[in-house]
Amino acid sequence: MHPMNRYEVALVTGASSGIGKAIALELASAGLRVLALGRDRAALDELHSTAGIVPVVFDLSDVSEVYGKIAGEKIDVLVNNAGLLTASASLVDLSEDDIDAMIDINIRSVFKLTRHVLKQMIERRRGHIFFTGSSGGLAPHPNSSVYGATKAAVSLFSSALRCDLIGLPIRVTELFPGRVETNLYRTALGKEGAKKKLYDDNEAIQPEHMARLLRTALELPDFVDVTRLEVMPTGQVVGGAQMSKLSR
């Protein structure tokens, strides 16, 4: 059976803006009932009014609290998209709170929410789990040690999860976007800082591009699992960050 004929409910985290918002809209247009989880109530309410998407206002820093909000939902598609880059800084310039926050959102919440939803997917013998990774988890970049490490952890987790699920009709896909125009970098670098460093004179992937690719992977037959989707602007190369040795 074509998976889109039996997938009914999707949960998308980090859906207030950027890639998560675009994915929520794309899945709603495909006919799924979409639960959009995020912190921005106004943004989620707008998704509800424009596309009938169900808002779930929540901060994933304590993911166990979200279980009650999705109780009774038979989730067929889980999109672990929420991510946090607190600052673009070297390790010694990050606070311990910065480190804890990135680990909480980028790793702990992903592992726990996936475990929770996966139990019901196994019982119903159907489902597709997506992870939004990052090119920052594929190669080292300056001022990105903790963020890159969290994304590398999710990448290995995604691959290992496929091993756990071998023999079950549940698919796992990781998205690897390169330079994409979202609030993630605006939060870390500031609006003008992100514009100058990343977007001026550079073409960037748009969130809608990632959403379309996710839908393509989702719509393939059950026996076809796109395990990784690595997407870069044509002018970007992973590991191409320029670094210079500084005297101390």
Curated annotation (Swiss-Prot):
Entry binding sites for substrate: S134
Q: State the source organism's domain of life.
A: Bacteria
Cite the binding residues for NADP(+). 8-32
Alphabetized InterPro entries for the sequence:
NAD(P)-bd_dom_sf, Sc_DH/Rdtase_CS, SDR_fam
Q: What class of enzyme is it?
A: oxidoreductase
What is a GO molecular function of this protein?
Answer: oxidoreductase activity
Question: Which catalytic residues are annotated?
Answer: Y147
Task: Alphabetically list the UniProt keywords.
Answer: Oxidoreductase, Plasmid
Q: What is its EC number?
A: 1.-.-.-
User: What family is this protein classified in?
Assistant: Belongs to the short-chain dehydrogenases/reductases (SDR) family.
Q: What is this protein called?
A: Uncharacterized short-chain type dehydrogenase/reductase y4eK
Upper classification of the source organism reads:
Bacteria, Pseudomonadati, Pseudomonadota, Alphaproteobacteria, Hyphomicrobiales
